[in-house]
Amino acid sequence: MPRRLDASERASFDQIPTTDLERARLVCVPVLTPGIAGMTLDRWMLLRRGHEHDRDLIAHELVHVRQWRELGVVRFLARYLGAYARGRWHGLGHRAAYEAIPLEAEARVVSGR
């Protein structure tokens, strides 16, 4: 069942714009791709069961909520998938190509993850 972040959670993420804290919906899911603890699609933060209280992961996914809002669906996906594809094209393995995506790098810096 999707849920909003509660007031204490919102207060703890002062680096995230209020608009995105209010828009975000956290969904605990039983399964994601192996090795993935969280994934964001627009305002929907999908967190693997057992990670729904991981503050650093939530902060990371909240950065993606902001990115989706600022860029919109088409631009976000074009930048994200384009960067991943370029990394793979240039011979990077999956993990290295993922880590080289600028949107992921920004989320890691802001969240400390």
Which role fits each region the language model picked out?
Residues M1-T40, G72-R113:
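Metalloprotease/metallohydrolase-associated module, dominated by Zn2+-dependent proteases
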Residues E9, I58-L62:
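Structural preference for long, well-ordered alpha-helical segments in enzyme cores
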Residues A37-I58, R69, A97-A100:
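Short pre-active-site segment immediately N-terminal to the catalytic Zn-binding motif
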Residues V63-L71:
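Active-site-flanking alpha-helical
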